[in-house]
Structure formats: structure tokens, C-alpha cells
A protein has these predicted regions:
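Catalytic nucleophile-loop/oxyanion-hole region of alpha/beta-hydrolase
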Residues: 60-88
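Proline/glycine-enriched tight loop/beta-turn segments at coil->beta junctions
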Residues: 17-23, 49
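N-terminal cap/lid segment of alpha/beta-hydrolase-fold proteins
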Residues: 1-19
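Gly/Ala-rich beta-loop-alpha elbow adjacent to hydrolase catalytic centers
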Residues: 96-104
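The conserved beta1-alpha1 loop
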Residues: 25-29
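Conserved alpha/beta-hydrolase
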Residues: 44-63
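The serine-hydrolase catalytic nucleophile loop
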Residues: 30-42
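Active-site nucleophile loop of the alpha/beta-hydrolase fold
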Residues: 117-121
């Protein structure tokens, strides 16, 4: 599956799958990057969901921003990202792996999500 690079709230991001009215924000774990979402995105696309993955600070295209990998930096970025995605999709879900799951839980404690999948939070 091919991914389309773009910027989501100033974060480097990849858009996976066909346009859809429902989508999942994919948050990688420690040492990961937005590119690791390929396998998940393929399965989500088969179920009719588009996936967007982002690089957290200190990872992928943001390696030089390691000092910004703190909740008071990441949580506002993720909240902006979700707000932008809500403008594109009717239904929004979240997948978080490890560090991404932790940041997802911090950023969206009360967000009305259509689905939430956490791997090793």
C-alpha cells in the first residue's frame, strides 16, 4: 500500500488508503515512525477505514526534536491533529502502540472516538 506524505498540524504525516469518511490516527511506539503503520493501514483499508500516521518528536522525520518528547509538547500537537482529522472524517478512531498509546490516553481522555486500539500502553 502506498502512502501519501503531508503535514498534519505541523507534524510529518502519511495518509494511507483510499479517501473515506472514517479514519484512524496511528501513533507509533518508542523508536518507531509513521512508516510503521503500513501493515495496520492495509488491514484498516480492507475494513473501509483510512489511516493517518504521524511522527512523534524524536522519531522519523523529527529525530532532531527529541527534547520535545514531553507531554506538554506532544498532547497539544495531538489535540490539534485530531481536530483537523474531525474536519475530514465523520468517524475517527485511534491506534496507539506503547509510547503512542500512552500519549493517546493523555491527549484524548474524553474524546468521542469511534474506536480505540491500544497495544502495550
Amino acid at each position: 500500500m502506498r502512502a501519501e506524505p503531508f503535514s498534519l498540524g505541523g507534524m510529518p504525516a502519511l495518509r494511507w488508503g483510499r479517501p473515506s469518511r472514517q479514519g484512524i490516527l496511528y501513533l507509533h511506539g518508542q523508536g518507531g515512525s509513521k512508516a510503521e503503520a503500513a501493515f495496520f493501514a492495509a488491514a484498516a483499508a480492507d475494513a473501509g477505514w483510512q489511516t493517518v500516521s504521524v511522527d512523534l518528536p524524536g522519531h522519523g522525520d523529527r529525530e532532531s526534536e527529541a527534547a520535545a518528547l514531553v507531554p506538554w509538547q506532544v498532547v497539544p500537537e495531538l489535540r490539534c491533529a485530531l481536530a483537523e482529522l474531525r474536519g475530514r472524517w465523520d468517524r475517527v478512531g485511534l491506534f496507539g502502540s506503547s509510547l503512542g498509546a500512552w500519549f493517546g490516553l493523555l491527549a484524548y481522555p474524553d474524546a468521542p472516538l469511534a474506536a480505540a486500539l491500544f497495544l502495550s500502553p
